[in-house]
Design a protein with these regions (language model features):
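Non-transmembrane domains of secretory- and envelope-associated proteins
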Residues: 121-158
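Residue-level preference for alpha-helix termini and adjacent loops
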Residues: 14, 19-22, 28, 118-127, ...
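Short beta-strand edge/turn micro-motifs at domain boundaries
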Residues: 98-126
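Short, functionally important structural connectors and interaction interfaces within domains
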Residues: 7, 12, 64-67, 116, ...
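Surface-exposed, charged secondary-structure patches
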Residues: 40-42, 46, 50-99, 151-158
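Early exported N-terminus immediately downstream of N-terminal targeting peptides
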Residues: 1-56
Length: 158
């Protein structure tokens, strides 16, 4: 609960979940009703926070996160750039190997917001877009939203 609260407070404000949702849903975003969009954004945000904090808790085995676990690389961007990629490396426990983690951000309304994260070259947006497209074909958008809500409830019980 402590790590989830930390993520809610320090991570969520820096992610544009509406933009991420648009990218993840693709064509389905355009045909979704405003209510479906709102519900999807809420459940998807809850899912991402719960899923990744659960993974972080497992990674750290419940202990504090070591200071040297993540290293950010120098930013390569121009002064007028509106989109940038911030690269980092995350150490694996018990290994000298580091996993590349890249954050894609865009500048709007005077602030930078994350719209995608790639772990070891695999985009969160692309992964969910593929997975959710199959689920939408099988169950419809409302079915996907219901499934996310159910998964969130399961993650809340952990």
């Amino acid at each position: 609960a402590r790590i989830r609260a930390l993520a809610e407070r320090n991570l969520v404000p820096h992610v544009d979940f509406e933009q991420v949702s648009r990218l993840v849903l693709g064509k389905s975003w355009r045909t979704a009703t405003p209510e479906q969009r709102k519900r999807f954004i809420q459940e998807f945000q809850r899912f991402v926070v719960r899923f990744y904090t659960a993974a972080l808790i497992e990674y750290t085995e419940g202990s504090d996160i070591p200071q040297d676990v993540m290293r950010f690389l120098p930013l390569r961007a121009g002064p007028g750039d509106k989109r940038v990629t911030v690269s980092s490396r995350v150490k694996q426990p018990g290994s000298s190997q580091a996993i590349p983690v890249d954050y894609r951000l865009f500048f709007a309304d005077g602030q930078w917001k994350v719209y995608d994260v790639s772990v070891d070259g695999v985009s969160l947006v692309a992964s969910y877009r593929s997975s959710f497209a199959n689920q939408i074909r099988q169950r419809g958008l409302d079915g996907l939203i219901a499934q996310l809500a159910q998964r969130n409830a399961e993650l809340d019980r952990r």
